[in-house]
Amino acid sequence: MRLNILNDVVDYFVLTESPFTVSGNEKPLYYQENKDRFGKFNDKIVHHVTEEIPNDFTHLLEKTKFHVAYKNNDPYGTPMIDLPVRFQRALFNRNNSAFGIEKAGATDEDLVITSDADEIINPLLLQDLEWFNPSNHYVAECRAFYYKLNFLYQEDWMGSRLCTWKHLKNTTIDQHRQDHQKAHKIQDAGWHFSFFGNEEDFKLKLASYEHTENNTDQVTSTASEKIEQGLDPLGRTNKLVTVPLDDSYPQYVLENQDKYAEFISAWN
């Protein structure tokens, strides 16, 4: 979906993946194993594989290329070397994506958009860049949807980050991710489609990412109920609201509702 939505407004898709989750479990290289399914986009995809995610990060105490110095504090005042190893892995994996951007041949003036796979910036923003100031960095405030394309979460999501390659390569990708309070915010700038799939997909997502505090029996045992009833995946108080598919959605989604019918809930 995101490739179709953004194909006409980007030069390259830099796709970074690893054979390990940040929890340390082995996982497939999904793009590499399904490359034939991406035939339309393969000429635009720059694939970067982080072959190994360390268990010990003491060799990164001092700053190295594209990586932060792990002796420094995170935004909450904890030295990064003292964080749980799953967070250190996530930090490493995210920052390592910059090598893929370098591989794509980015120049200092190029606009670089960094996103999680489930974050899609609005392509209309990229058709006219008069608003973009190369001295600034930006965050796209996105509408968030869980389970279904039209199960709307009632708080915006801080999604894709935008800046020049010159700016990004002299900081780190994770720093841009964490410093969204300092970024210039672009309102209604995209979509965050997350926790899509069935009950097993729900559980796999929670088992794979760094926030293992959410991977509890209390959360996962009610996965099916949450999906069916539109309840917050992590047990927060906000209930999801079913909304109509209208012109606030990507044109590609509106034109392919039959293709995504299983992910659309009736709103009438």
Give the location of each predicted region.
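Acidic donor-binding segment of Leloir-type glycosyltransferases
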Residues: 7-82
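Histidine-anchored nucleotide/phosphate-binding helix
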Residues: 1-6
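Catalytic-site signature of metal-activated, phosphate-bearing donor transferases
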Residues: 55-110, 114, 119-268
